[in-house]
């Protein structure tokens, strides 16, 4: 396990010096080509809900996704090229607080893309379907991104949007954590290119901050008319 990954995991599972240690739990993880951790999940996980983090729009990604699902369905997940690690989760640690809030849920973890925007996402599921995503900031930049996401979702919640489903904000603190609901249907397809419904959704979002005014009321009316007249003269 690389040092960056160890630091990320420690950030999740470490408590203070006085906190008690739980019995180490067995986790499996799937690595990227550079051997950094991509997903980490309890070894007893029965459904590969961590695939909700994965963009499966390309043919190669679709094949990978289907293969993983088949192996889990046949209880052959041990054939997946993964590694195991035992993690002692501290009482009071960030991960333990999240799990305590959803005691009946299973979970998996996406460790984020390396860089200043990196954040951790803890996925919580009922054994079959992802229900909650807890986003954890690990830098000032990712903290700002999570804060911005909270404000955007809060604003969209009060808009009359007919083509968009907006995740519900379940919890938020300004320090490092945003919890949102999963709105992705159990059965859905990810298109490889922009489609009509996405264009309509983007148009609705774009219209939120637009304000329509009559031409006669525009402050720049006379400046624009003057520029047009100058163009006519030059022509």
Where are the regions that the model predicts?
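Juxta-kinase regulatory segment immediately upstream of eukaryotic protein kinase catalytic domains
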Residues: 2-110
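An alpha-helical support segment within catalytic cores of ATP-dependent transferases
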Residues: 93-105, 210-235
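Protein kinase glycine-rich loop
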Residues: 112-114
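ATP-binding glycine-rich loop module of kinase domains
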Residues: 118-148
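Conserved kinase catalytic-core helix
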Residues: 149-166, 184-227
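Short beta-strand micro-motifs within the conserved protein kinase catalytic domain, predominantly
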Residues: 167-176
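Conserved short submotifs of the Hanks-type protein kinase catalytic core
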Residues: 175-186
């Amino acid at each position: 396990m690389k040092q960056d990954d160890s630091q990320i995991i420690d950030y999740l599972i470490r408590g203070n010096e006085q906190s008690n240690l739980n019995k180490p739990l067995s986790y499996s993880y799937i690595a990227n080509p550079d051997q950094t951790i991509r997903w980490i999940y309890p070894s007893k996980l029965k459904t590969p809900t961590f695939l909700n983090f994965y963009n499966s729009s390309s043919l190669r990604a679709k094949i990978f996704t289907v293969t993983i699902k088949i192996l889990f369905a046949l209880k052959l997940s041990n054939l997946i090229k993964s590694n195991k690690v035992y993690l002692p989760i501290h009482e009071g640690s960030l991960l333990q607080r999240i799990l305590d809030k959803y005691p009946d849920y299973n979970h998996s973890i996406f460790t984020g893309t390396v860089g200043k925007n990196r954040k951790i996402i803890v996925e919580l599921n009922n054994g079959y379907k992802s229900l909650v995503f807890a986003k954890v900031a690990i830098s000032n930049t990712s903290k700002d991104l999570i804060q911005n996401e909270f404000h955007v979702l809060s604003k969209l919640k009060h808009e009359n949007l007919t083509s968009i489903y907006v995740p519900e904000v379940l919890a938020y603190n300004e320090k490092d954590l945003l919890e949102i609901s999963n709105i992705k249907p159990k059965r859905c397809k990810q298109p490889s290119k922009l489609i009509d419904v996405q264009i309509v959704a983007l148009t609705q979002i774009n219209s939120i901050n637009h304000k329509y005014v009559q031409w006669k009321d525009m402050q720049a009316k006379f400046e624009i008319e003057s520029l047009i007249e100058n163009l006519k003269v030059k022509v």
